[in-house]
Amino acid sequence: MAGMDLALKAKLQKQRYHIVGEHGGVKTCHWTKESLLRDRQCYKGKFYGVKSHNCMQMSPVVDQCNLACTYCWREPHMDTLELTDQDPKELLYESVRAQRRLLSGFGGNPKVPREKWLDAQNPKHVAISLNGEPTLYTRLSEYMDLCHKHGMTTMLVTNGTLPKVIEKLDTLPTQLYVSVDAPNKKVFDEVCKPKWNTNAWDKFSETLDLLPSLDTRIVCRHTLMQGINMSDQHIKEFAALDRRADPDYIENKGYVFVGHSRENLGVENMPSHEEIMDFSNKIAPLTGRKVLSDSRPSRVALVGQEITPIPIPEPTMFFPKDLGIAPSVKHLQMAN
């Protein structure tokens, strides 16, 4: 296995990623920091009862994706595809050790309650959403099973273009997010930009039809871009896709003009919160649902039938007492 491109690895480390194994990575979420420092919660706390200081944001493949979405603010991924089969237990334990390393500086901060910081050392939620397309990790099912056995929820975010992988998962995530960012094939090809597979929209469509059969919580997430996918006609087309998928929830989240996406989109593509709410109020009745909540700081609205907290599994396995903390890493320095 060749491993991660060194130039990309250097960029990610500069952005405070802790690289785990050949392709995995962990990064402290903005809202984890906000929870520790100012007792603020992200929208997952308001919508699903997720405590931000207990959430670990990671990906088994931070450098691998089969799409090149215009709205993605992450660094561009590798141009070649290299599937990873890292041992799930190693990935989980090293990710937790990395999370502890990333949070270590908060332990001595007088603004951070000591008990809360100690509680954060053992995550209760794993957001498999940091970067890349996690369904490219060949042992994803085993990894999520281990998370559940350690008393942690899993929140998997996928672009939905690999339906066979999702269909064959022996262990499903606690909550499965599918990015539904285009209402039709034309917008999909323009916005999501498949790298290799010309049938990506067809595969994505297969995933939508698969979702109703999956015994887990399903979320369809629409990333809203003004002037691109928010017209009244787009809303009708999105609603048709949502009715096929029949998710528990629909999240309407506004695009943010940050990171690499600034090379593809403009600040004018950022919808206001009022525009996000207008979209949500229009799509809700078309899907037989209602607007349940919203979060202005996170630029998102929730559509569904009712809010139910995400269930945390009872642990049957425990981290070793001597698991410890990942060592500090000397970042790569690449020539300009």
Annotated model-derived regions:
Residues 53, 121-123, 295-299:
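Short Gly/Ser/Thr- and Asp/Glu-enriched loop/turn motifs at secondary-structure junctions
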